[in-house]
A protein has these predicted regions:
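Transmembrane alpha-helix signature in integral membrane proteins
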Residues: 15-43
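Loop-to-helix entry region at the N-terminal start of transmembrane alpha-helices
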Residues: 17, 21-25, 74-95, 179, ...
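Cytoplasmic-entry segments and transmembrane alpha-helices of multi-pass inner-membrane transporters
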Residues: 40-73, 88, 98-102, 106, ...
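C-terminal transmembrane helix and the adjacent membrane-cytosol boundary/short C-terminal tail
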Residues: 48, 105, 181-218
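Short cytoplasmic-facing helical segments at TM-TM junctions of multi-pass membrane proteins
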Residues: 100-138
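Glycine-rich helix-loop "coupling/hinge" segments at transmembrane-helix boundaries
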Residues: 74-75, 152-181, 186, 213-214
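Alpha-helical membrane-protein architecture signal
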Residues: 12, 16, 50-53, 82, ...
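Transmembrane alpha-helices
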Residues: 27, 90, 123-155, 178, ...
């Protein structure tokens, strides 16, 4: 344990730089996955005929090992951060799409009927009723997806990308256990912090979504 602390203090700038790179790669991947996965999930809930084929494709892609996925992408986008981000977004789509679709489908049909009866358009029902009610479930998906993305970003170093995976990979190749452990612990710590932040946001969204629906209907 003392060796790990000493290494971190001695190479603090090195590890902080890798931490920044890891945050950058993870943040971009998470934002893209939220936008793309959220839109796909909403689209699937509105057009249910395509939901099964879409979900089957996403489930199939999710079964491909991460190293294999990186291997498939290298001829298309080369090595580096771009390929790592593309791979992370692909893997992040399943929890994002699934939770968005599930959240939209779980909305009480009576609420939708009431809003439609009051003259709301399809878009208004989607934006003002279904989406706010589905938001807590969507947030749960974002939370789990963010943790998974941060953890999975550790493999980015295998294709020449940055991040804390560089420390892990270097530690493995040089038989430096302390280096590997520092990189792993920093990823775990980062994941825990992000999980805590999303837990706070999730609680606040649950509270505000209920209030906003009441205002819309009454």
């Amino acid at each position: 344990m003392l060796e790990i602390v000493q290494l971190f203090i001695q190479r603090k700038e090195f590890f902080m730089n890798l931490l920044y790179q890891h945050l950058q790669i993870s943040f971009i991947s998470i934002v893209l996955a939220i936008l793309i996965g959220g839109l796909i999930g909403i689209f699937m809930s509105e057009y249910k005929k395509i939901s099964k084929p879409f979900m089957s494709i996403i489930n199939f892609v999710y079964t491909i090992p991460s190293i294999s996925m990186l291997g498939f992408l290298i001829p298309l986008s080369g090595v580096g951060n771009t390929t790592a981000i593309i791979a992370l977004v692909i893997y992040a789509l399943l929890p994002m799409v699934k939770n968005t679709y599930t959240g939209m489908e779980q909305v009480d049909k009576k609420m939708i009927e009431a809003a439609t009866g009051l003259g709301s358009t399809r878009f208004q029902v989607l934006w003002k009723i279904k989406f706010p009610l589905a938001l807590p479930v969507i947030m749960a998906g974002i939370r789990s997806m963010a943790i998974m993305t941060i953890a999975l970003a550790g493999i980015a170093s295998f294709i020449g990308a940055g991040g804390l995976g560089v420390a892990i990979y270097r530690g493995i190749t040089t038989n430096n256990t302390a280096m590997t452990l520092v990189g792993s612990l920093l990823i775990a710590l980062l994941a825990l912090i992000v999980d805590g932040l999303f837990a706070i946001i999730e609680k606040r969204i649950q509270h505000h979504s209920k209030k906003s629906i009441k205002k819309q209907l009454f």
